[in-house]
Regions:
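Bacterial Sec-dependent N-terminal signal peptides
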Residues: 1-34
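Short, conserved micro-motifs composed of acidic
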Residues: 32-71, 121, 125-127, 131-467, ...
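TPR-repeat structural position
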Residues: 86-87, 125
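Periplasmic OmpA-like peptidoglycan-binding domain that tethers envelope proteins to the cell wall
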Residues: 382-390, 579, 587-659
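Periplasmic peptidoglycan-binding/tethering modules of Gram-negative envelope proteins
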Residues: 455-583, 616, 620, 657-659
Length: 659
C-alpha cells in the first residue's frame, strides 16, 4: 500500500514519497503564546480561537471528492526540499493536505505526519499538536505509531495520568462534606436503579423537553427463539422519582427498535429499526408522528439520502428540527463507524448525508451523537481519540467559525474503565443521562444520571492555567482541586505536572476556590473570579521537620489564641487534615524571666490552647496531637538581650509519621 498517491510519472516523484516520510530534522519547541496583564491576572488567548487559528482543519473536500491528487503540486513540494525553504514547504504542503478527501486519510496520512513536524517551527501555536492528534486518529500501517505518540505526548499537556484516581477523588469529596456543609459536593456516576434498568442491556436514553420523561432502549424482552429483542421503553418522573419503565408498544415490533430521539415539539419521534423488510440496510432510521388522538403512527423510513446499505442508527435531532446527526458504518467512511449529518431543506426533504469530518471521526468507531442546541456542542462516543479512560469514552466538540474544535474528553467523572455511550443532557443543562458499563462486564450497559461535571459542561471552555514552584523556582508535586462556589459543579482534581504546571477548562464569570495540596508544603487556598482565561502562579511554603511561626506571640503571661494566629494555625490544621497518617507535637517554650514553675505552667497552657484550637475548630483527633510545655528548659540562644529572650519565647511544631 502506498502512503501517498501512486504516481505513474517520473521517478523523481516516486522518490518524493520516501522523502516526505523520512526527511526533516526533529524539532520539539512550540512557539509561546503571548499574554498580557490585566488586573494582576494574566489574560490568555481565547481557547476556541487558538484551536481554529488554521483553516486547514475544516477540510472542505471531505464531502465533495473521495480522493485528492495533484501531481504538479507534489513536484513543487519536492523541489522545496532544501535548506532555508522550510517555510515555503510548510505552506505548500499545508495547502495540499487541506484539500484531502476521505480516502486521503487512509492512504496519505504520512503527509500529515510530515506537516506536523514542520508545523512545530513554521506553524501557529497549537497547530502541530492538533496535527499529531490527527495522525494518531487516522494512522494506518506504514507509520511508526510509537514515534508519533511520543511526539504528541512531548507537547500535549492533557494526559490521562494528570487526573487524580477516582478513589482519591472520593476522599477529597468526603473531606469537603466535613468542612463545607452549605455546599455539599454533587454526586457522580449514579445508576438510575431498578425502575429503569434491568438485568439485561439498557442504553440509548433521550429526555423529553420537560425533563419528566425518558425514552431508552432495552434488551430485556426475549423473542420466541430465546434471542434478546431490542425495544423502546419509557418512564415518567413524578415528584423527582421515575416510574417503572413501560414498553413503547405503538413503535415496538417483531424487529429491533432503539436509539430514539424526540423533536422539540414532541410530535416527531426518530428511531432506528433493524432487519425490517422495508429497510435499505442492516439498520435504518425511521420517523413516527404523534397523531391527534395522542397515538404514534405513520412510521416512515427516512430514505436513501440518510440510510445506506450498511448500519445507520443513533439519531440526534437539533431543536430547530432541520439537522439530524447519526452514526453509520457505510462504505466510504473514515473508520468502522462515523458520525454523519443531514440537513432538511425548505420543502422538508432531508439532504444527502454528510460526514462530520476527520476532526470528529477516526479510523476506529464514533457513535451516539448528541447535539446541544443552545451552545452548538456535539457530544459523541469514541474509541479512536488519543486520550481515553476506557474502551469507548464520551467526547465533546464545539462548532466554531465553520468547523469542529478538537474533541475534548469529558473526564474521569463521566468516563471509566468500561464503555460510555448515548450521552444526553436535560433542557437546563443540569443533569446528564447516558449508558455505561464496568471494566469487568463491558457489554452489560446500564443507564446513569447525575449532575453534569465541569469537564462535560457545554460552556466549560475558558482555561485556568497555573503553576506551583518552590522558593528556588523548582517544580513541586501536588494535587490541584477547583471548587465551583456559585453552582457547585464538580471538577475532577488533577496532579501537578512534572514541570509544575496545571490547567482546567471552566465556565466563565463564576467564583471558584483553588486548593493545592502536597506532602511537602502547606496547603494553598485562593478564591478567584473567572473573568476570561486566567493564570495563577504560586510559590509553595515548604514544611520543615520543626516549624516556628513569628505570628504565634502570646500576650504577656497569657495563653489566649489571638486572631492574628489563625492563619498559621489553619495551615497546620489543613496539613494534618490532608495527611491523616501524620502526628503533631506542639512544644511550648518561655524565656528565663520569672520562676521556672510558673513558666512551665504557662508554656503548657499555651501548648494546650493551640491543641484545643486544632481539635475544636478542625475536628482533628486528640490522639494525633501531643502538647508539651517545657518552660525555659530548652533555650535556643543564651539570653543576653531582650531580643534573645524573644527568640526563646516560642511555640514549635514537629510533624512525624504516626507509629
Amino acid at each position: 500500500m502506498y502512503p501517498f498517491p501512486k504516481l505513474n510519472t517520473k521517478p523523481c516523484l516516486l522518490a518524493l514519497l520516501v522523502w516526505l516520510i523520512a526527511c526533516g530534522t526533529p524539532v520539539y519547541a512550540q512557539k509561546d503564546k503571548k499574554g498580557f496583564k490585566k488586573g494582576g491576572v494574566v489574560q490568555l488567548n481565547d481557547t476556541l480561537s487558538s484551536y481554529s487559528q488554521s483553516d486547514i482543519f475544516r477540510f472542505p473536500n471531505v464531502n465533495k471528492i473521495p480522493f485528492y491528487q495533484d501531481n504538479a503540486k507534489l513536484q513543487k513540494i519536492r523541489a522545496l526540499d532544501k535548506p532555508g525553504a522550510e517555510g515555503q514547504m510548510y505552506a505548500e504542503l499545508k495547502a495540499y493536505v487541506k484539500n484531502f478527501g476521505i480516502e486521503n486519510f487512509s492512504k496519505n496520512v504520512a503527509m500529515i505526519w510530515r506537516l506536523a513536524r514542520l508545523s512545530e517551527t513554521q506553524g501557529p501555536p497549537g497547530e502541530a499538536l492538533l496535527l499529531y492528534k490527527l495522525v494518531l486518529k487516522h494512522h494506518q500501517q506504514g507509520l511508526n505509531i510509537n514515534e508519533i505518540y511520543k511526539r504528541q505526548q512531548m507537547i500535549d499537556p492533557d494526559k490521562k495520568e494528570n487526573y487524580v484516581p477516582l478513589d482519591f477523588y472520593y476522599k477529597l469529596v468526603e473531606y469537603r462534606k466535613d468542612i463545607d456543609t452549605l455546599r455539599p459536593p454533587q454526586s457522580v456516576l449514579i445508576n438510575m436503579g431498578g425502575y429503569i434498568n434491568s438485568d439485561k442491556e439498557d442504553y440509548g436514553p433521550t429526555v423529553g423537553n420537560t425533563d419528566d420523561m425518558i425514552l431508552f432502549t432495552s434488551k430485556r424482552n426475549e423473542n420466541m427463539d430465546r434471542t434478546y429483542n431490542e425495544d423502546l421503553f419509557f418512564s415518567r418522573k413524578a415528584e423527582d422519582y421515575w416510574d417503572d419503565a413501560q414498553p413503547f408498544k405503538s413503535i415496538n415490533s417483531k424487529y429491533n427498535e432503539g436509539s430514539a430521539c424526540l423533536s422539540k415539539n414532541g410530535k416527531s419521534l426518530y428511531f432506528a429499526r433493524c432487519e425490517s423488510p422495508d429497510g435499505l440496510g442492516n439498520c435504518d432510521l425511521y420517523v413516527a408522528i404523534l397523531k391527534a388522538d395522542s397515538t404514534w403512527g405513520d412510521v416512515k423510513n427516512l430514505g436513501p439520502n440518510i440510510n445506506s446499505a450498511g448500519w445507520d442508527s443513533h439519531p440526534s435531532l437539533t431543536h430547530s428540527g432541520d439537522t439530524l446527526f447519526f452514526a453509520s458504518n457505510r462504505a466510504g467512511s473514515f473508520g468502522l463507524s462515523d458520525i454523519y449529518f443531514s440537513v432538511k431543506d425548505k420543502k422538508g426533504v432531508w439532504g444527502k448525508a454528510q460526514n462530520a469530518g476527520p476532526i470528529i471521526n477516526t479510523v476506529q468507531s464514533e457513535v451516539s451523537p448528541f447535539f446541544h442546541h443552545t451552545y452548538n456542542v456535539l457530544y459523541f462516543s469514541s474509541n479512536g481519540h488519543p486520550l481515553n479512560f476506557g474502551e469507548f469514552d464520551i467526547y465533546k466538540s464545539n462548532w466554531y467559525k465553520g468547523g469542529w474544535t478538537e474533541p475534548y474528553n469529558t473526564g474521569p467523572l463521566v468516563n471509566g474503565g468500561g464503555s460510555e455511550y448515548y450521552f444526553t443532557i436535560d433542557s437546563r443543562s443540569k443533569n446528564l443521562y447516558y449508558a455505561r458499563s464496568s471494566e469487568e462486564d463491558i457489554k452489560n450497559l446500564d443507564l446513569y444520571s447525575f449532575p453534569v461535571p465541569m469537564e462535560a459542561q457545554p460552556l466549560a471552555i475558558t482555561q485556568l492555567k497555573g503553576s506551583l514552584k518552590d522558593p528556588a523556582g523548582k517544580p513541586v508535586k501536588g494535587i490541584v482541586s477547583v471548587i465551583d462556589l456559585d453552582e457547585g459543579v464538580e471538577v475532577a482534581p488533577k496532579y501537578i505536572r512534572e514541570d509544575g504546571t496545571f490547567d482546567f477548562n471552566l465556565i466563565n464569570k463564576r467564583n471558584y476556590l483553588l486548593i493545592i495540596q502536597g506532602d511537602d508544603f502547606f496547603r494553598i487556598e485562593e478564591i478567584f473570579f473567572m473573568d476570561g482565561e486566567t493564570e495563577i502562579n504560586k510559590i509553595a511554603e515548604p514544611i520543615e521537620s520543626k516549624i516556628a511561626f513569628q505570628s504565634l506571640e502570646f500576650e504577656n503571661g497569657k495563653a489566649n489564641i489571638l486572631p492574628e494566629m489563625h492563619t498559621d494555625l489553619d495551615k497546620i490544621a489543613n496539613f494534618l487534615i490532608d495527611h491523616p497518617e501524620l502526628h503533631l507535637k506542639i512544644s511550648g517554650h518561655t524565656d528565663s524571666a520569672g520562676k521556672e514553675e510558673a513558666n512551665l505552667r504557662l508554656s503548657q497552657a499555651r501548648a494546650d490552647a493551640i491543641k484545643n484550637y486544632l481539635v475544636t475548630e478542625f475536628k482533628i483527633g486528640t490522639v494525633r496531637i501531643d502538647a508539651i510545655g517545657y518552660g525555659s528548659s530548652k533555650p535556643i540562644v543564651q539570653e543576653i538581650t531582650d531580643d534573645h529572650k524573644q527568640l526563646n519565647r516560642r511555640v514549635e511544631f514537629e510533624i512525624s509519621k504516626q507509629e
